[in-house]
């Protein structure tokens, strides 16, 4: 589904025309996107976690629900947390709205060196020194460093981390930068109910 597939003239909404959301089913089995505690019911798409621009199909209800037309969607790579990489090649993480913890998912907007595009990079997320500390690992799998480009990866950390029992705790993400230096960033995390 690409940007050219939009048959409507509604304006694209969301931060910079794009949001990152989890895909769920409600009690009636209808698919919805959960984004910042709001439910958006797509009229044309289903997946597990995706980035997408959308067009509102009328008013968003006062309690954060509304029908949306998904202009296009791209599923985000979702490796299993707790699996380590055999190597840890550096990468840089953007401090932007896409790098976030929401709905039990850690989503990382990163930049790294890429070769010709035929080599798939691997990502691992392992437990750090404390219960709410995780370490992101990146393996280029021998890909040649020709140019820098960005990407998205997400991890369902809800079952990987201890239950916060309704409290918001500090989640620390650690990684190695492309310059080989250690880095970290903190997020508010609350277990998905």
Walk through the language-model features, giving the residues of each:
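Bacterial Sec-dependent N-terminal signal peptides
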Residues: 1-18
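Extended, well-ordered protein cores
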Residues: 24-26, 30-37
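Beta-strand/loop nucleic-acid-binding surfaces
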Residues: 35-49
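Flexible glycine-rich surface loops and low-complexity tracts that mediate binding to linear polymers
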Residues: 45-72
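Short, solvent-exposed, Trp/other aromatic-anchored flexible loops in extracytoplasmic proteins
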Residues: 48, 52, 140-180
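Transition segment at domain starts
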Residues: 69-99
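Short helix-loop boundary/capping segments
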Residues: 95-145
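Short beta-strand elements
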Residues: 180-193
């Amino acid at each position: 589904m690409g940007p050219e597939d939009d048959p409507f003239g509604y304006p694209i909404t969301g931060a910079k025309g794009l949001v990152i959301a989890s895909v769920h089913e409600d009690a009636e089995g209808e698919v919805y996107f959960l984004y910042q505690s709001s439910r958006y019911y797509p009229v044309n798409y289903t997946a597990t976690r995706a980035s997408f621009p959308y067009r509102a199909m009328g008013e968003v209800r006062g309690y954060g629900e509304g029908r949306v037309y998904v202009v296009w969607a791209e599923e985000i790579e979702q490796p299993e947390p707790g699996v380590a990489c055999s190597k840890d090649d550096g990468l840089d993480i953007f401090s932007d709205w896409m790098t976030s913890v929401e709905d039990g998912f850690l989503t990382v907007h990163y930049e790294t060196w890429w070769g010709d595009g035929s080599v798939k990079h691997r990502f691992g997320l392992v437990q750090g020194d404390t219960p709410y500390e995780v370490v992101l690992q990146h393996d280029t799998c021998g890909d040649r460093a020709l140019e820098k480009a960005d990407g998205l990866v997400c991890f369902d950390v809800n079952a990987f981390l201890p239950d916060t029992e309704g409290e918001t705790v500090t989640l620390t993400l650690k990684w190695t930068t492309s310059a080989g230096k250690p880095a970290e960033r903190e997020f508010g995390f609350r277990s998905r109910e």
